[in-house]
Design a protein with these regions (language model features):
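Generic N-terminal amphipathic, Lys/Arg-enriched alpha-helix
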Residues: 1-21
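Hydrophobic packing residues in well-ordered alpha-helices of helical domains and bundles
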Residues: 7, 26-29, 55
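Structured helix-beta-strand junction loops
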Residues: 17, 39-40, 153
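A short, well-structured juxtamembrane/interface segment
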Residues: 21-39
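Glycine-rich phosphate/diphosphate-binding loops and the adjacent beta-loop-alpha structural elements
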Residues: 41-42, 51
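Hydrophobic beta-strand scaffold residues
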Residues: 43-44, 139
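Glycine-rich phosphate-binding loops that contact phosphosugars or nucleotide phosphates
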Residues: 51-193
Length: 194
C-alpha cells in the first residue's frame, strides 16, 4: 500500500468513527460534568499510556480553559500525574491499584470518575470505577473497540467503536476539546478562551 493510500484510509476511518459517535452519550457526559461543577464535586480522571496523556490534557483544558475567569471552578484531579505516587503503589502494592488508592485519599460521595481505556479492560481503571460505583459516585467510561468491561460497568460511556487503538485515542482527544468547548459555552456564553 502506498503511503498516500494509507493516509487516506486513516482519515476515512477516523472521520467515520467520529460520525458514528452517539451524540446523546456525549451530551449525557457533559451534563454529568456540569452537575459536578454546580455541586462542587471532584472530577477524577485516569488512564494508561496515551490515555494517561489524554487524562492530563483533559484536566488542563477544563481547569484552565473552562475555569479561567469563573468565580466557581471545576475541580478536575488527574490520577495520572504524580509519578512518585504511581511508582510507589506499583512497586510496593500492585500496578492494578495505582488509581484506586489515590482516589481514596480525596473521594467524597457524589464525585465523578472518568476512566479512559482504549480496550476497555485496563484493570487499574476498572478497580477505581468499581470503587466509585460502590460508594455513591458517578462513573464515565471512554472506550474504543467494543468497549470492553469498562463500557459495561460505567454508568455513562462514550465508545469509539473501531478496532484501532490510535483512532480510539484520537477520538478521546477530540472529546477533550469538544467537552471543553461545550462546558465553556454553557458557563460563559462563548467557546473562546485565552
Amino acid at each position: 500500500m502506498k503511503v498516500e493510500n494509507q493516509i487516506e484510509n486513516y482519515i476515512v476511518k477516523l472521520t467515520k468513527t467520529l460520525k458514528d459517535l452517539n451524540v446523546k452519550d456525549i451530551e449525557q457526559c457533559s451534563s454529568v460534568l456540569l452537575d459536578a461543577y454546580e455541586n462542587k464535586k471532584n472530577i477524577f480522571i485516569c488512564g494508561n499510556g496515551g490515555s494517561a496523556s489524554t487524562a492530563s490534557h483533559f484536566a488542563c483544558d477544563i481547569n484552565k480553559g473552562v475555569s479561567y475567569g469563573l468565580d466557581k471552578r471545576f475541580k478536575i484531579i488527574p490520577l495520572t500525574d504524580n509519578l512518585a505516587t504511581i511508582s510507589a503503589y506499583s512497586n510496593d502494592v500492585n500496578y492494578d491499584f495505582i488509581f484506586l488508592e489515590q482516589i481514596k485519599n480525596f473521594y467524597n460521595p457524589g464525585d465523578v470518575l472518568i476512566g479512559i481505556s482504549g480496550s476497555g479492560n485496563s484493570m487499574n481503571v476498572l478497580k477505581a470505577i468499581e470503587f466509585v460505583n460502590e460508594n455513591e459516585g458517578v462513573t464515565i467510561g471512554w472506550t474504543g473497540f467494543k468497549g470492553g468491561k469498562l463500557k459495561e460497568v460505567s454508568q455513562f460511556s462514550i465508545n469509539a467503536n473501531i478496532d484501532d487503538m490510535q483512532i480510539s485515542e484520537d477520538i478521546h482527544m477530540t472529546l477533550v476539546h469538544l467537552m471543553m468547548k461545550v462546558l465553556r459555552k454553557k458557563l460563559t456564553g462563548s467557546e473562546d478562551y485565552i
